[in-house]
């Protein structure tokens, strides 16, 4: 099932394609092939996509606790979705 917000996924794909296209790549012949994508590039782009997707789905919650002596404590928790 696709996520509710596809913008980070599309952005990751566009950035990945821009990184894979090299400006120095000039084809000397009509039949020359583009440079192959290496396994390191695939792993790096997959990790970046996973990281961006996790960041975009994280929920931030701030809790303020007041004590008797009027001091303020702040508790910040960042939770990720449970996959539902």
From Swiss-Prot:
Residues 26-30 are cytoplasmic. Its main location: host cell. Keywords: Host endoplasmic reticulum, Host membrane, Membrane, Transmembrane, Transmembrane helix, Transport, Viral movement protein. It is found in: Host endoplasmic reticulum membrane. The keyword Transmembrane applies. GO terms for biological process: transport of virus in host, cell to cell. The chain crosses the membrane at residues 5-25, 31-51. It is a multi-pass membrane protein. It comes from the Viruses. Residues 1-4, 52-84 are lumenal. One of its GO terms (cellular component) is membrane. Belongs to the carmovirus double gene block protein 2 family. Cell-to-cell movement function. This is Double gene block protein 2. It comes from Carnation mottle virus (isolate China/Shanghai) (CarMV).
